[in-house]
Amino acid sequence: YETPNMEKLAQQGMMFTQAYASSISSPTRCSLMTGCNASRHRVTNWTLRKNTKTDAVSNTLEVPDWNYNGVAQVHGTNNTFIATSFVQLLKDNGYHTIHCGKAHWGAIDTPGESPYHFGFETNIAGHAAGGPATYLSERNYGYDEAGNSTLLFSVPGLEKYWGTGTFI
């Protein structure tokens, strides 16, 4: 594939020729948001519920005390890596910042669960869960008619699309 705009951007900036991505989404997403690798931010597994580890129990391994609440820009939540996001830096320098899709940087009920916390001015469907409850607008993306979440992975911010046939 030809990607002339991306190649031009790389020529003007910095191109990384050696990189690492975790096979689990949360650590890599946290790395992209903070610029730190997983060994530095210590988010080494997926995040979901506040103060809840997602590691399998092992009789053989001693699992380290990792940052299972994800990343945030403010102090106050234990087991959270604190950093300024690159999005906040862009916003502070006049860019309009939009997030669309999965977020999954912090556990539910922590600052890191919301893309707005990291400097995004617009958020379309981003939240703490690593995927949508449903892709179907006929099911209100996991909400009942009163707007109450019916599923853990209910997708926020898509109310105007409920019942429209819009598939995400």
Residues covered by each model-derived region:
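Formylglycine-dependent
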Residues: 48-96, 103-168
